[in-house]
Amino acid sequence: KFIDTGLGMTADEVEEYITQIAFSGATEFLSKYKDKTTDDQIIGHFGLGFYSAFMVADEVHIDTLSYKEGAAPVHWTCDGGTEYDMQEGNKTTVGTEITLFLNDESTEFSNEYRMREIIEKYCSFMPVNIYLSKENAPQEYETIDEAELRDDDVIVERIHEDAKTEEKENDKGEKEVVEVSPAKDKVKINKRPVSLSDPEPLWMKHPNSCTDEEYKEFYRKVFMDYKEPLFWIHLNMDYPFNLKGILYFPKINTEYDSIEGTIKLYNNQVFIADNIKEVIPEFLLLLKGVIDCPDLPLNVSRSALQNDGFVKKISEYITKKVADKLTGMCKTDRESYEKYWDDISPFIKY
C-alpha cells in the first residue's frame, strides 16, 4: 500500500486525472506529446505514472477522500483491462491510499528490505518525507521528556521521575544533601516513524549557508567514501535553466582505487541514473557528485535524454564551472593547486 496525507480527490477528479488518461485519451495523449519540445514533457504528467502500477500488479485499488467540504470518499478498482469500477468508499481521513495486488512475478516488492533498497536508491532526497512500515509489526515505544511531546504523538504512559540527590561535603566540611538532577516529567509514546528521505538535501541550500563539515558529511553519506574530498563546487543556477548540485574532487589513488567516479543525476530530487554521458562531460566522470536539473528533457524511459541542444548547454555550463574553479585556485591559492596537482592534473590536461 502507498498512503499519503495529501489533498485527496473527489470522484470527478479521479475520473479526470486517473480514468480519462487510461481509457479515453491514452492514444491522443501520447500523440500530443510526440516530438514536442521540453515545454511538453510527458514525464511527470499527473496521473500517467500511476499506470506503471499495472506492470507489477494484477489489480489496483484507490481509496481517496478529498479535503473539500462535503466530499464523499471514493473507492476505485481496476484489473488493468478496459473497465473499472468506481463507487463511494469508506475512507475517513483526507488523503489517498493505493493498494497493489502484486502479480506472481513481482512478489519481491512485498519484501521490506527490497522496498527499503528501492526507496533509498531512488527517493532518498524526495521533497516529502517517506516512511516504510510493516503491517502487523509489533508496536515499539520510546520515552521522551514531556516538553518534547508533539500533537501527533500517541501517549502510552506518563512517567514522573523524582529529583536525584547525593550527600556531599560542603566548604565547611559538613555533610549536606544536594540535588544533582531535577525532577522530570516524561512520557512513553508509540515510537515515532523515521523518514527514509531527506526533503532538504545539501545541494538545494544556498552555498553560503553550508559549512565545510556539512559538505564532507554529505559526501560520506552519499558515496560511502570516508576519505575526505579535496574540495568541491556547489552549482546553483536558475537561468536560463534550473540546475543545482555539488561536484566533489576526490583524492585519486591510482595504485589502489578505481579512477572512475560517480555523478548521480536527479530530476526534482528523484534519482534518474549514474554517469549519464550526455549531461556529464566524459573527462569529468572522475568526479563524484550530484546534479539536479528539473528542466532536464527526459523521455518515457527516464534514463534516456532528448533535445540535444538543451543537454549540450547543461554540459557546457558544468564544464565552465569546473574550469573556473581550477583557474581560480591556480591564481589565488597556488599552494593548494600544487599540492593537489596529481589529483587534478587529469582535468587540467584535458
Question: Model-derived features: where do they sit?
Answer:
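GHKL (Bergerat-fold) ATPase N-terminal catalytic module, capturing the glycine-rich phosphate-binding loop
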Residues: 1-110, 117, 124-125, 140-147, ...
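Glycine- and acidic
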Residues: 2-3, 41, 100-101, 201-203, ...
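Cytosolic catalytic regions of ATP/NTP-dependent phosphoryl-transfer enzymes
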Residues: 61-69, 73-145, 178, 191-208, ...
